[in-house]
């Protein structure tokens, strides 16, 4: 339940009346996710508990790959905000979200946590548009392999905090399926062939203008 007394508090996006209807009584415990989603989310959490690690190993994920996910450059929720998917959903469902258009079968929910609740932020904002950078910062951008692709990166002293969050769900006849979540503004998927040519070009154009921040040292 949120501060308004309803299971989740969503605001309607322009073209998503149907999604608002389907989300009206959404409870965090009703959102389905698999162990592979938990593995993917290691790149958006600061760590994990022993039970999750045990579950990942039992599911066939090897220690080397688990550690690699935990060290990938990217935006991460602080450990005092959430360390797993259930905890994250319980947190963000307390705050209003706007439903955004994604161009695919998913729905994207973007919201803001009150700074009064988490004065130091809920996580890091490790992806910025190049227009948010100074001229000297833009000159220091470099390419690095990240998530299997050559993507733009910039070394900084400290990645800034954020109070913003993005949650991506897929509506199905059986309910909503968790796709991903991360601190910060909505983003397009990384360009992949499975997306189709037009969507892949849209995603490439997005990531050609966005930079991953990595801390020095």
Give the label of every model feature segment.
Residues 41:
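Glycine-rich loop/hinge motif
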Residues 44:
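An extracellular/secretory-lumen and virion-surface interaction module
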